[in-house]
Design a protein with these regions (language model features):
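Catalytic cores of phosphodiester-bond hydrolases, prominently lipid phosphodiesterases
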Residues: 1-142
Length: 142
């Protein structure tokens, strides 16, 4: 995989260089000023359709997919998941860290369980691959 916040670079790789390598459009927030890419636009139906023309998946910030959990513990999933799925895009959110858990989880395994089991992501970006692999091996249905 090649992942980038820069949509122009990913378009160049796919359309000009004709790469067959899997490409992931990373999604940030415009206020972060990571590139000239308009992330607000890319998160729309029209924007995600455009992403599907040059990328195989998206890499959203985890908070762009889940904003928290409700009183029963069910994830509050944003429309971004559905929009990406409607455009046949893989979803690999970032960055899952043992030492920086969101307020709605109390452990790394709980965070992984929420995203893999309830949200249904295809993969993740993590700084703790050993723990992610252990989780996946223990929770694999194969």
């Amino acid at each position: 995989f090649i992942q980038s916040f820069d949509s122009d670079m990913l378009k160049y790789l796919r359309h000009e260089l004709k790469t067959r390598i899997k490409l992931v459009q990373l999604l940030g927030e415009n206020r972060w000023r990571l590139s000239d890419t308009d992330f607000s636009y890319l998160k729309t139906e029209e924007g995600m359709k455009e992403v599907s023309e040059y990328a195989d998946g998206i890499g959203p910030w985890m908070n762009q997919l889940v904003t928290g959990v409700d009183f029963s513990g069910k994830a509050q999933i944003t429309d971004l998941l559905k929009i990406a799925r409607n455009n046949d895009l893989w979803i690999h959110p970032y960055t899952f860290r043992v030492d920086r858990l969101p307020s709605y989880t109390s452990s790394f395994d709980e965070l992984l369980d929420l995203f893999f089991q309830e949200v249904g992501v295809d993969g993740i970006f993590t700084d703790h691959p050993d723990q992610a692999v252990r989780y996946l091996e223990q929770n694999s249905s194969n």
